[in-house]
Swiss-Prot record:
One of its GO terms (cellular component) is cytoplasm. It comes from Xylella fastidiosa (strain 9a5c). The keyword Cytoplasm applies. The keyword Calcium does not apply. It comes from the Bacteria. Pfam families: Sdh5. It is found in: Cytoplasm. Belongs to the SdhE FAD assembly factor family. This is FAD assembly factor SdhE. An FAD assembly protein, which accelerates covalent attachment of the cofactor into other proteins. Plays an essential role in the assembly of succinate dehydrogenase (SDH, respiratory complex II), an enzyme complex that is a component of both the tricarboxylic acid cycle and the electron transport chain, and which couples the oxidation of succinate to fumarate with the reduction of ubiquinone (coenzyme Q) to ubiquinol. Required for flavinylation (covalent attachment of FAD) of the flavoprotein subunit SdhA of SDH and other flavinylated proteins as well. Its main location: cytoplasm.
């Protein structure tokens, strides 16, 4: 089972549920702040499919953080002390626009 509660196949067994899972994640990642919405959409579009289960777990925990903290971390106004979040931030910032 996936983090969002849907049934998820392994990489060898793609299913029709993957687009639905991605849509749920896009909805969950919506913040109403254009900058954050754009960054999270880029991550889901360019990285999610090849991300490891560990990285996916970090991303889902990241979404539980307060919006103002996410914005300060991703914009570089504040350094995130959590090493796994810091690595994810570097990954998100490096994604193509």
């Amino acid at each position: 089972m996936c983090y969002c509660g849907c049934q998820r196949a392994t990489a060898e067994e793609p299913t029709m549920d993957e687009p639905a899972e991605l849509n749920k994640l896009r909805w969950r990642s919506r913040r109403g702040m254009r900058e954050l919405d754009h960054l999270f959409d880029r991550y889901l579009s360019h990285r999610w499919a090849q991300a490891s289960e560990a990285e996916r777990g970090v991303f889902l925990r990241f979404l539980d953080c307060e919006d103002d903290k996410l914005w300060r971390w991703l914009m570089g106004y504040e350094v995130c002390q959590d090493a796994s979040f810091a690595a994810l931030i570097v990954t998100i910032r490096a994604l193509p626009a």
